Amino acid sequence: MTGAYAASYLPWILIPIIGWLMPAVVMGLLFLYIESDA
């Protein structure tokens, strides 16, 4: 996979990932960290 090919479809994939997938992953990891620590 070349950089130019990835750049053509990366923005519209990256926007929803950053928008709702990353916060969900961060919340899940924080929850697991807090639960395992308690």
UniProtKB/Swiss-Prot annotation:
CC annotations in GO: photosystem I; plasma membrane-derived thylakoid membrane
Keywords: Membrane, Photosynthesis, Photosystem I, Thylakoid, Transmembrane, Transmembrane helix
Subcellular location: Cellular thylakoid membrane
Keyword rRNA processing: no
Any GO BP annotation: photosynthesis
Location (main, coarse): membrane
Membrane spanning stretches: 12-32
Membrane topology recorded in Swiss-Prot or TrEMBL: Single-pass membrane protein
Similarity-based family: Belongs to the PsaI family.
General function of this protein: May help in the organization of the PsaL subunit.
Protein name, UniProt field: Photosystem I reaction center subunit VIII
